[in-house]
């Protein structure tokens, strides 16, 4: 099984797929972003029926550092 993305938003002609990762600090956030991107690609998230005209796939990392506590890394896949 390929699994499922963390969040999928469907509109009339668009599907937006999110894969979220949690990082303890900025250094780990960079690594987690790479993991999320790879996971979206290898598991082919978003390519399900019914097909939509546009597929947007986003990898995002939440940095849990107490001084940051925000999504700091994003990438369109």
Predicted feature locations:
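Structural signature of nuclease core domains in nucleic-acid processing machines
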Residues: 1-77
């Amino acid at each position: 099984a390929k699994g499922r993305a963390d969040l999928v938003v469907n509109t009339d002609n668009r599907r937006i797929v999110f894969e979220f990762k949690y990082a303890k600090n900025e250094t780990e956030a960079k690594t987690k972003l790479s993991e999320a991107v790879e996971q979206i690609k290898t598991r082919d998230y978003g390519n399900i029926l019914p097909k939509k005209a546009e597929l947007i796939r986003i990898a995002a990392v939440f940095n849990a550092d107490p001084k940051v506590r925000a999504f700091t890394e994003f990438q369109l896949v």
